[in-house]
Amino acid sequence: MTGLAEYGADAAVHMPPDTLHLALAQAKVSHAIIKGIDTSEAEKMPGVVRVLTHKDVKGKNRITGLINFADNKGDGWDRPILNDTKVFQYGDALAIVCADSEAHARAAADKVKFDLELLPEYMSAPEAMAPDAIEIHPGTPNIYYEPHIEKGEDTKPFFDDPENVVVEDSFYTQRQPHLNIEPDVGYGYLNEQGQLVIHSKSIGLHLHALMIAPGLGVKFPEELVMVQNTTGGTFGYKFSPTMEALIGVAVLATGRPCHLRYNYQQQQQYTGKRSPFWTKVRMAANKKTGKIVAMETDWTCDHGPYSEFGDLLTLRGAQFIGAGYGIPNIRGDGRTVATNHAWGAAFRGYGGPESEFPSEVLMDELAEKLGMDPFDLRELNCYKEGDTTPTGQKPEVMNLPTMFKALRPKYEAAKAKAKAESTDAVKRGVGLALAVYGAGLDGPDSSEAWAELNPDGSVTIGSSWEDHGQGADSGAQCTAHEALRPIGLPVEKIRLVMNDTSKTPNSGPAGGSRSQVMTGNAIRVACEQLVEAMRKPDGGFYTYDEMKAEGRAVHQDGKWTAPARDCGKNCQGEPFCCYMYGLFMAEVAVEVATGKTKVEKMTMVADIGKVVNRLLTDGQLYGGIAQGIGLALTEDYEDIKKHSTMAGAGIPTIKDIPDDLELIYVETPRPDGPFGASGTGEIPLCGPHPAIINAIYNACGARVTHLPAYPEKVLAAMPKK
């Protein structure tokens, strides 16, 4: 730890003297028709060079959402770069001020005037689904994608069978903000070749280039280069392009370098959030055996006004509600809904926390109705030979029984401790949750990397494995080191070129815990090809000079495609080749008088395949658990003004996260993972919140099904004496 990393805001200090600093003129309403934009007063402000509107955008002025499914009713071209006809959400940008300083730019942005015709604001999915709601995007219904899942037999007979116990409940997971410390920042310029170069916190460089190029009116890769800044945590919000296109518009319009930095209020109000899910789940289990025989689901994804990746996110409900259990018969319907609240962006877990919260809380309700211990019910029903996932896929490993065995003594000790330490004033409880998540984007996802032997015998690895705090450089280097073992190359002789589309191939976005599996395998393939090219027929390996003398290629391109199959009709398929598995146990204390909950300990049994770097992996799991505590108890972005600061949005403080976080690893090698590894980042946020909610119920009898579990909710849910 040196503190020498230069982040995007630091770069402004070193940019050329003619650099323009940008500020956005943004809407302060959530839904309106734009009748006019008056920039005249702003243009007269000190230091202002240009004030840009949609009229200055050279291309389509749209960011494509890259529609994933043919039955999506939208076309994906619904998000403006600079809004021209309508305001779709609070904070939409209508103009860019380009000035000689950030202070001058911000002062002028406040002088831009909008003539708006206000429209009804639909701030939740139920409001946007109402019969009298107008279309947010005229021509596209507010409900624009509707997946349906069918697995096994019709479920109705199982719910009608008197030999089965039935439980059902309704759930809500909130619009969780990412609460990264570093606000969004980026800059751009025209290079010596006349290409537009954009530096940002992007975690999907090639993806974002394809999304913004048509809107800017440039061709990729001929006229556009994307480079990732040194980046702290993004937790997924940068899976969506945020300011990249805005910077591009300004550079192309002015011909000068441009720098844009959000303050924290803008970070909250003008970047994406976790999409809320409204979910209903029913389960039926045999009274005598406790085996789950059927499940019915209904889920609604409130994805805000912009459709990008909304269909894929909604599909996660089909894939992960009830995941981890061998449920033979499933029926369910989901829907993606456009609203006027914050646009839906990827967030760690990407549909997993939303989908597994309802089924994991319902598992506790089912256990109570069956008269079983929640641990025993989960252990009985977890994946075993012959079971399949909700999408009908055979799990790649059968590791859950081993994980339950590892947790059992911890669970029994925790129950005894809670019973012994509970008082009339402070009740203590223990809660469990099982979580499963896929490592990758759906279906035959792929990634590319290259390996090159250098004259000094070192090897350079090139990839676009974007780093947003998870340790991509270490992951790339460690994977390459393992693959290059035959030539005995020490790790210090492995160099990295990363995250510049003019130099590195399309490795795909760093999201969905895909990079270790996908890009790790691409690096492995490139390195193995290089090793084979260096191998002498009679043993040993060629040097660089010998390779060049014999005309052997010192550069090898590697590509790897996942052996997976997209979910097709009825959401059945094999969407991931590698999964991650987690068992979570929460120990909580609840103040009976106030409903305030304190998490005293979290235990996680994790199976993420072979651990590549224990220090990094520990950090990933600890961080995800901390975010899960926030998701359970405090975090939200519902009130646009109240929740626009870190404290207002409920970020957990050091007092809210227990020092006692215990990690237990079960390392089951993955057949398709690089050297047996799977992903890591998503799984620690898929299960803490239901475990905490179940622990609250175990402590005081308060069942909270709509997150976050604020003290007043817990207090209201406590049984009345």
Question: In which residue ranges do the predicted regions lie?
Answer:
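Thiamine diphosphate
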Residues: 229-255, 259-262, 269, 476-480
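C-terminal catalytic domains of large/alpha subunits in multi-subunit enzymes
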Residues: 55, 218-225, 253-258, 287, ...
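Extended active-site and interfacial segments that coordinate phosphate-rich ligands
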Residues: 22, 110-123, 203, 214-215, ...
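Phosphate/diphosphate-binding loops
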Residues: 100-101, 256-303, 521-546
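Flexible, low-hydrophobicity surface segments
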Residues: 1-140
